[in-house]
Amino acid sequence: MKNLLDLSYEELITEITNLGLERYRADQILDWIFNKKVNNFDEMTNLSKKHRALLKEHFSIPFLKLLDKKVSRIDGTTKFLWELEDGNTIESVMLFHPDRITACISTQVGCPVKCIFCATGMSGFVRNLTTGEIVAQILSMEKEEKKKIGNVVYMGMGEPLLNYENTIKSIRTLNHKKMGNIGIRRITISTVGIPDRIIQLAEEGLDVKLALSLHAPTNFKRDQLVPLNKKYSIEEILNAVKIYQKKTGNRVTIEYVLIKGMNDEISDAKKLAEILKNMKVFVNLIPVNPTVEDLKKPSRERLLTFKRILLESGIEAEIRREKGADIEAACGQLRLKRIKSTS
């Protein structure tokens, strides 16, 4: 039995016409799923009983099982812990802004990258998510909260570009006007930097936003924070980003988690400005989340100094406003606690 959420629009049409249904039935089915959040064929009342029975024989529409939910009393940020059909767990987050709702979604169960400041990597890597499991996070959150998501960031558990095919296919699904209907410029892929995949992304014809999790201005420091840097150097990654920018013309967000005593020195800020010189970038400065006890946030004064040095060097930068601090909204924390409690 096929997961219908794994299928592209064109694949769904092919599948149902092969079963003898008319093409337009695909639009009816997708309207039930994406607009009405119905994942039971029996409830699709504009389909005949015969068609419903036939579809049930061949397809499933698995939304995700909610295991836990935390809501921030500060800003309403909502964090979800989901169970997949095989019993694995993943996290998603809904972030509320005055003019939009953003979803932060996962692409892997666990993560192989193991950045030292991220809770997800602490539990190891299990597997890639399917296209359907990525898409189901959006549908399940919308169904649970009865709200429409307008922006999507692939910044949850896992490295999206190490699950490239399913990530790209899920973006096409979420963007398709008959499916997720989310504007392509409202979708962001966040990556630690897989050079060949960044270049491949530039050729996809998808005008998504790209965010690079850099976190250090030198290979020596980045090797300590992001172990994958030993495979892909900063120079290789930034060269790939330059190729991406030449092809797309898009500005790239540089994510930089600031950790006291590790990457927050004045020399780090100056070096960061140097390596980003003449690039079309915006730097998002992120005070570290306390996922690991010995990692501390820099002082407010140091954050402002770091930002000022970048601005004076002609690099756009901002300190990201923390959301969901009271519910540990950083990805991986809720799942890690559950794993520890059940082991």
UniProtKB/Swiss-Prot annotation:
Kinase among keywords: no
- In its keyword annotation, does this UniProt entry include Ligase? no
Q: Which cysteines are joined by disulfide bonds?
A: C104-C331
Annotated [4Fe-4S] cluster binding sites: C111, C115, C118
Which cofactors is this protein said to need? [4Fe-4S] cluster
Q: Name one GO biological process term.
A: tRNA methylation
Q: Which reaction does it catalyse?
A: adenosine(2503) in 23S rRNA + 2 reduced [2Fe-2S]-[ferredoxin] + 2 S-adenosyl-L-methionine = 2-methyladenosine(2503) in 23S rRNA + 5'-deoxyadenosine + L-methionine + 2 oxidized [2Fe-2S]-[ferredoxin] + S-adenosyl-L-homocysteine; adenosine(37) in tRNA + 2 reduced [2Fe-2S]-[ferredoxin] + 2 S-adenosyl-L-methionine = 2-methyladenosine(37) in tRNA + 5'-deoxyadenosine + L-methionine + 2 oxidized [2Fe-2S]-[ferredoxin] + S-adenosyl-L-homocysteine
* EC numbers, comma separated: 2.1.1.192
Please list the residue ranges annotated as the Radical SAM core domain: 97-326
Which key words are in the record? Answer: 4Fe-4S, Cytoplasm, Disulfide bond, Iron, Iron-sulfur, Metal-binding, Methyltransferase, rRNA processing, S-adenosyl-L-methionine, Transferase, tRNA processing
Spell out the catalytic residues.
Answer: E91, C331
What Gene3D superfamilies does the database record attribute to this sequence? 1.10.150.530, Aldolase class I (3.20.20.70)
Q: Name one GO molecular function term.
A: tRNA binding
Show the CDD domains listed in the entry. Radical_SAM
GO CC annotations on file: cytoplasm
Domain of life according to the entry: Bacteria
Any binding details for the cofactor?
Binds 1 [4Fe-4S] cluster. The cluster is coordinated with 3 cysteines and an exchangeable S-adenosyl-L-methionine.
Q: Where does S-adenosyl-L-methionine bind?
A: G158, E159, S190, S213, L214, H215, N289
- Report the subcellular localization: Cytoplasm
SUPFAM superfamilies recorded: Radical SAM enzymes
Any further remarks?
A: Reaction proceeds by a ping-pong mechanism involving intermediate methylation of a conserved cysteine residue.
Q: Which family does it belong to?
A: Belongs to the radical SAM superfamily. RlmN family.
The record describes the protein's role as:
Specifically methylates position 2 of adenine 2503 in 23S rRNA and position 2 of adenine 37 in tRNAs.
Question: What is the protein's given name?
Answer: Probable dual-specificity RNA methyltransferase RlmN
Gene this chain is encoded by: rlmN
